[in-house]
């Protein structure tokens, strides 16, 4: 990771890279969910991303990660696997924290790495529910300014 980076709004020509990061990261991170789930939802998510508030992290003209929002709900933070644990997710999260007074998100109970990350960043668990599409327990978390 260099000192020449920027966070900017998603551009339409970013979508193929963003979707590759989305698919690769979900399959790797959520190994308790069959990969066919992510593949089957690919086109739906692609359309949703193109119609959402999405910010990308670009390092030396290479797109390395993104964060997607729907109003005040974080739909996900995704960083290329070889760029993880370098502070990119935190920078993306801090960027949107400066835009919003509060943020919600859902995170799978089994995704302990993400759960700890969000708690460290000031999110607290509000409730839990079962994601009907995966039958996995997820926490609903909140951050307030």
Give the residues covered by each predicted segment.
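Conserved GNAT acetyl-CoA-binding A-motif
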Residues: 98-110
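A short beta-loop-alpha structural element at the N-terminal edge
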Residues: 5-20
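Conserved acetyl-CoA-binding loop of GNAT-fold acetyltransferases
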Residues: 119-129
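Conserved GNAT-fold acetyl-CoA-binding loop/helix
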Residues: 19-46
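A short helix-loop-beta-strand connector motif used in the catalytic cores of GNAT acetyltransferases and
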Residues: 44-56, 73
